[in-house]
Curated annotation (Swiss-Prot):
Pfam families the record matches: Glyco_hydro_79n
GO MF terms, alphabetically ordered: hyaluronoglucuronidase activity; transferase activity
GO-annotated cellular components: extracellular matrix; extracellular space; membrane
Protein's organism: Hirudo nipponia (Korean blood-sucking leech)
PANTHER family noted in UniProt: HEPARANASE
Recorded catalytic activity of this chain's protein: Random hydrolysis of (1->3)-linkages between beta-D-glucuronate and N-acetyl-D-glucosamine residues in hyaluronate
pH dependence: Optimum pH is 6.5.
Top class in the EC scheme: hydrolase
Protein family per UniProt: Belongs to the glycosyl hydrolase 79 family.
Activity relative to temperature: Optimum temperature is 45 degrees Celsius.
Active-site residues, Swiss-Prot/TrEMBL: E176 (proton donor), E290 (nucleophile)
Protein name stated in the entry: Hyaluronoglucuronidase
UniProt xrefs under Gene3D superfamilies: Glycosidases
Length: 489
């Protein structure tokens, strides 16, 4: 048994995250004829219930294909209006292939209607990514010559107004311009594009009330955050980052347990703060607009298993501690990192982890000091969510939720003297049979599963008198009589 001293400064609030902290991503490639849309029923009552288990939150429709997504095309559309290449240079060929591959990416009105119904019915907000790669004035081999073509977006905006949509829709423009742009967009262009989008949205007051976020870039594209701040900082609600720890194709179980990866996320946050340190928009909120464990769709038989939860839980805690307002998980289904099985909609372990977190953890965040030089025990503390309908126990204001993970090889007891003798409600998540690659997760020894397609009640273990975690497990501890002043508000 290893004892680790933990101090929680519950007198000082270090951050406050959004009530809609959790989000899930839906890849726009599913709208493609070659995508998986035919296998996905977004009108399923089961899906409504599962999304409600993460609400209030964001349902993001985005990804690389969003860059090329068109709205309700008819048979007479002429693609050449957007592209008129005359030469046959390698650059032309590359861009043309990308265009031909994506040009069939067409969002039907009926599908958009279903997306609005899904998000409203599950108490989520629809975050919709517009097609930044549809441009005019582009010349091969030149930068800074093209401008975003807003005509497709305006078709969608006009349709939203005609249907009375808008009260639960937020907007993005483009996906990873630092990585997937066929136009080699510059930071300045991205800023100008967002300024243009804001101007268009001003014509539609019912739509302009929603958030406008971007630029949706990863580690290598942090300079685009500065470009957006400089070009359209007054018009965006938040800066969005994409974050993955490693290449899912070259990773295994040991990668997901490697404590050295925990610091990668903090390095990203620090890098963004440094880039914006002299900007008048340095205090603009940050979101993780798309994030998971490994890029390239995750790791087969790992990303959708219990072991993926260590990085997931640490990300939720560390993001909140850095005042990151929203964390959007890639992806609801599809790839190896899907939260749900795309055929049955049965939840994978990370869904259950996020659901428990969403049911127990409030938005007020406190500083935590952990005396563990190995970094294998990670601990976070936030006010308890007191209005959850999914927990058997009902908690009062003043309660504190401590959540922790242990990737080490021995039992760990968190020595938190300030809460010694307090009542502890434990929610410990473990894999079935102790197998880290199990797709079944147990809550206090009982399997978490749907009951007639309904979410089960989350029952606490009230017998524990210490904050203890077995090797390679994670869990939540609610201190119901912590009497934290900041949690009484």
């Amino acid at each position: 048994m290893k004892e680790i001293a933990v101090t929680i400064d519950d007198k000082n609030v270090i951050a406050s995250v959004s009530e809609s902290f959790h989000g899930v991503a839906f890849d726009a490639s599913l709208f493609s004829p070659k995508g998986l849309w035919s296998f996905v029923d977004i009108t399923s009552p089961k899906l409504f219930k599962l999304l409600e288990g993460l609400s209030p939150g964001y349902f993001r429709v985005g990804g690389t294909f969003a860059n090329w997504l068109f709205f309700d095309l008819d048979e007479n559309n002429k693609w050449k209006d957007y592209w008129a290449f005359k030469d046959k240079t390698p650059e032309t060929a590359t861009i043309t292939r990308r265009w031909l591959f994506r040009k069939q990416n067409n969002l039907k009105k009926e599908t958009f209607d279903d997306l609005v119904k899904l998000t409203k019915g599950s108490k989520m907000r629809l975050l919709f990514d517009l097609n930044a790669e549809v441009r005019t004035g582009y010349e091969i081999g030149k930068k800074m010559t093209s401008t975003w073509d807003s005509s497709e977006a305006e078709k969608l905006f006009k349709y939203c107004v005609s249907k009375g949509y808008g009260d639960n829709i937020d907007w993005e423009l483009g996906n990873e311009p630092d990585h997937t742009s066929a136009h080699n967009l510059t930071e300045k262009q991205v800023g100008e594009d967002f300024k243009a989008l804001h101007k268009v949205l001003e014509k539609y007051p019912t739509l302009n009330k929603g958030s406008l976020v971007g630029p949706d870039v990863g580690w290598m594209g942090v300079s685009y955050v500065k470009g957006l701040a400089d070009g359209a900082g007054d018009h965006v609600t938040a800066f969005t980052l994409h974050q993955y720890y490693f290449d899912g194709n070259t990773s295994d179980v040991s990668t997901y347990l490697d404590a050295t990866y925990f610091k990668k996320l903090q390095q990203l946050f620090d890098k963004v703060k440094d880039v914006l340190k002299n900007s008048p928009h340095k205090d603009k909120p940050l979101w993780l607009g798309e994030t998971s464990s490994g890029y390239n769709s995750g790791t087969k038989d790992v990303s959708d298993r219990y072991v993926s939860g260590f990085l997931t839980l640490d990300k939720l805690g560390l993001s909140a501690a850095n005042n990151v307002k929203v964390v959007i998980r890639q992806t609801i289904y599809n790839g190896y990192y899907g939260l749900l099985d795309k055929n049955t909609l049965e939840p994978n372990p990370d869904y259950w982890l996020m659901h428990v977190h969403n049911s127990l953890v409030g938005n007020t965040v406190f500083k935590v000091d952990v005396s563990d030089p190995t970094n294998k025990a990670r601990v976070y503390a936030q006010c308890t969510k007191t209005n959850s309908k999914h927990t058997q126990s009902r908690y009062y204001k003043g309660s504190l939720t401590i959540f922790a993970l242990n990737v080490g090889d021995e039992d760990v007891t968190l020595k938190i003297d300030q809460y010694s003798g307090k009542k502890i409600y434990s929610y410990i998540l473990t894999p079935e049979g102790g197998q880290l690659t199990s797709q079944k997760v147990l809550l206090n020894g009982k399997e978490l599963k749907l009951v007639s397609d309904q979410l089960p009640e989350l029952n606490a273990d009230e017998s524990k008198t210490s904050f203890t975690l077995s090797p390679k497990t994670f869990g939540f501890f609610v201190v119901s009589d912590a009497n934290v002043e900041a949690c009484k508000k």
